[in-house]
């Protein structure tokens, strides 16, 4: 069980059985709650271009840092999706949230789907999967458009041998830096690197193992709430064919929005278009 403790301007969820573990979150606004679950290897700060828009729409907006990232404590283990979904469940329970909306970006889509699998949808109104890893990243015989095992092995090897250098190149691919007419700045790359490089090395590696290897295809039947799927057709990290399109085919009630020319980090490069898409999804009953 997690208990809420608050430092000045810094709310945390603290586990009763492990006082050394604290999950950091930020909670603003009122109204129906939206929880924003960030991607790998960043933190809740990655939603900064979406939070003001959602607040202006009248929602209560909650971001949190996955364990080992941002201001949340690292642990030795517990980075599989059952444990990560448990952290989300505790956040919802301890904050006494009802009729929740869940937005998962990239790796964060896994927490959303596993939450629905393990805890059901009774307390969930709708969800959004943005540049999500759902349902499967890894290439297999029945998933030919996935990322090859060799590429995934290369990522894990680089994380173990030269993590900070790998993260620099990763975020260029994250935004298709140098390939888009709508580029992000070098400062944005530096900002992301500063967040990612400060994450726990253990958490970074173990979370990569989780998103690279978890097959959510059998769990798509558990997604029984209204769903928005947003994916860029030029995503170099999680290709649309292995993720967005398959998710749209496997989830019963969904709106599938393809961002033309969108990279993985379309929450930054195409923030205005994404925010318009989220607004339409939230306001159309």
Task: Place the predicted regions along the sequence by residue.
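Conserved HGGG/HGGXW glycine-rich cap/lid loop of the alpha/beta-hydrolase fold
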Residues: 17-77
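Flexible "cap/lid" loop of the alpha/beta hydrolase fold
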Residues: 113, 117-118, 122-161
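Conserved acidic catalytic loop of the alpha/beta-hydrolase fold
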Residues: 83-100
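Short beta-strand/loop motif that positions the catalytic acidic residue
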Residues: 223, 229-231, 235
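Conserved alpha/beta-hydrolase "acid-adjacent" motif
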Residues: 236-242
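Conserved alpha/beta-hydrolase catalytic His-Asp/Glu region
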Residues: 135-138, 142-146, 158-221
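Alpha/beta-hydrolase fold catalytic core
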Residues: 1-35, 56-59, 97-98, 279, ...
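Catalytic active-site module of serine/aspartate enzymes centered on a nucleophile-bearing elbow/loop
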Residues: 254-285
């Amino acid at each position: 069980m997690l208990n809420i403790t608050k430092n000045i301007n810094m709310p945390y969820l603290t586990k009763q059985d492990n006082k050394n573990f604290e999950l950091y979150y930020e909670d603003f606004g009122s109204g129906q709650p939206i929880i924003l679950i960030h991607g790998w290897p960043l933190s809740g700060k990655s939603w900064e271009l979406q939070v003001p828009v959602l607040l202006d729409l009248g929602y209560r907006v909650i971001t949190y840092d996955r364990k080992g990232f941002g201001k949340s404590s690292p642990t030795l283990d517990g980075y599989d999706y059952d444990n990560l979904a448990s952290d989300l469940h505790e956040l919802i329970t301890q904050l006494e949230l009802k009729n929740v909306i869940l937005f998962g970006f990239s790796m964060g889509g896994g927490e959303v789907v596993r939450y629905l699998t393990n805890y059901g949808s009774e307390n969930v109104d709708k969800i959004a999967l943005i540049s999500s890893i759902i349902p499967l990243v890894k290439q297999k015989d029945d998933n030919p458009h996935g990322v090859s095992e060799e590429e995934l092995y290369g990522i894990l090897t680089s994380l173990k041998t030269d993590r900070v250098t790998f993260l620099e190149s990763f975020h260029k691919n994250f935004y298709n830096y140098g390939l888009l007419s709508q580029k992000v700045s070098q400062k944005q790359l530096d900002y992301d690197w500063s967040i990612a490089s400060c994450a726990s090395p253990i958490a970074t590696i173990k979370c990569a193992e989780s998103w690279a290897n978890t097959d959510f295809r059998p769990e798509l039947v558990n997604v029984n709430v209204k769903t928005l799927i947003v994916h860029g057709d030029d995503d170099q990290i999680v290709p649309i064919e292995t993720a967005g399109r398959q998710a749209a085919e496997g989830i019963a009630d969904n709106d599938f929005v393809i961002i033309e020319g969108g990279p993985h980090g379309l929450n930054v490069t195409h923030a205005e278009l994404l925010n318009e898409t989220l607004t339409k999804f939230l306001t159309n009953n």
